[in-house]
Amino acid sequence: SQLPVMEGDHIVGIVDESDVLLHVYGDENRFRDPVATAMVSKLDKVAMGAPIEALLPVFDRGHVAIVMDGERFVGLITRIDLLNFLRRRVQ
């Protein structure tokens, strides 16, 4: 699961379990480090009104789509989220 890292009202990164585990591996004192030291700050932003196909290049890169309404963070979409959405549409 990915979590947004916010600075005020702005998304500045995302972090997931593997980011945290890789950051603290071998030194449990690193659990005290700021979240920003473990986050991914290169974000693939997609406009809220973009077609679903705009997600495909993001997922092809193995990234998470950061959904934006202008400059406002709305949410994030993972490949699994898209697969679950498509599965529900078929049922």
Model-derived regions, located:
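A glycine-centered beta-loop-beta connector
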Residues: 3-19, 59, 67-81
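The conserved cystathionine-beta-synthase
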Residues: 6-7, 24, 44-62, 68-69, ...
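Conserved protein kinase catalytic domain
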Residues: 21, 36-39, 83
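Short secondary-structure boundary/capping segments
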Residues: 27, 35-37, 56-57
